[in-house]
């Protein structure tokens, strides 16, 4: 089975979005480094849905780039469902421009970043952030993209 993707496009305009193959590749280059099989839903949304979910689950009154919802199976239940990623199209596009990054690279970074959250990584504490950012950079560079944090390091 490897990594199974359920891609949901919940946006008014689907033009210019990465392809299903792009999203699959990004998952395939990230998750198998930690576990051999997984099911992941990626839902691409507009700002309204991202804002509502970010407010409900994180108490933040604005849309955000990616939300991660890990699936926690009941004890004793063997299931490959890793969780859901909710990615806001407008926020990703705006950030790519602001950060002077190629749009496809920023989409890839959001999938890698969100996948690491599903796998239990976090960036609340400085040491956790350093470890997570290091993994993100390694994975992104392994796919031929630049360090996603290069602007912050200069």
Curated annotation (Swiss-Prot):
Pfam families: YbeY. It is an enzyme of class 3 (hydrolase). GO terms for biological process: rRNA processing. It comes from the Bacteria. Its cofactor is Zn(2+). One of its GO terms (cellular component) is cytoplasm. The keyword Phosphoprotein does not apply. Binds 1 zinc ion. Its EC number is 3.1.-.-. It is found in: Cytoplasm. Zn(2+) binds at residues 113, 117, 123. The keyword RNA-binding does not apply. Its main location: cytoplasm. Keywords: Cytoplasm, Endonuclease, Hydrolase, Metal-binding, Nuclease, Ribosome biogenesis, rRNA processing, Zinc. InterPro entries: MetalPrtase_cat_dom_sf_prd, YbeY, YbeY_CS. HAMAP family: Endoribonucl_YbeY. Belongs to the endoribonuclease YbeY family. NCBIfam families: rRNA maturation RNase YbeY (TIGR00043). PANTHER family: ENDORIBONUCLEASE YBEY, CHLOROPLASTIC (PTHR46986:SF1). Single strand-specific metallo-endoribonuclease involved in late-stage 70S ribosome quality control and in maturation of the 3' terminus of the 16S rRNA. This is Endoribonuclease YbeY. It comes from Vibrio parahaemolyticus serotype O3:K6 (strain RIMD 2210633).
């Amino acid at each position: 089975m490897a990594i199974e993707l359920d891609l949901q496009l919940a946006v008014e305009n689907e033009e210019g979005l990465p392809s299903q193959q792009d999203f699959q590749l990004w998952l395939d280059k990230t998750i198998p480094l930690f576990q051999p099989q997984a099911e992941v839903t990626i839902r691409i949304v507009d700002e309204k849905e991202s804002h509502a979910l970010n407010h409900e689950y994180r108490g933040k009154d604005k849309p955000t780039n990616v939300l991660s919802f890990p699936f926690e199976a009941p004890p004793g239940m063997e299931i490959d469902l890793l969780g859901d990623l909710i990615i806001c199209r407008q926020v990703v596009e705006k950030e790519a421009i602001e950060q002077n990054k190629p749009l496809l690279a920023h989409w890839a970074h959001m999938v890698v970043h969100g996948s690491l959250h599903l796998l239990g990584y976090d960036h609340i504490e400085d040491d956790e952030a350093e470890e997570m950012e290091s993994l993100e950079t390694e994975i992104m560079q392994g796919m031929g993209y630049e360090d996603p944090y290069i602007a912050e390091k200069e």
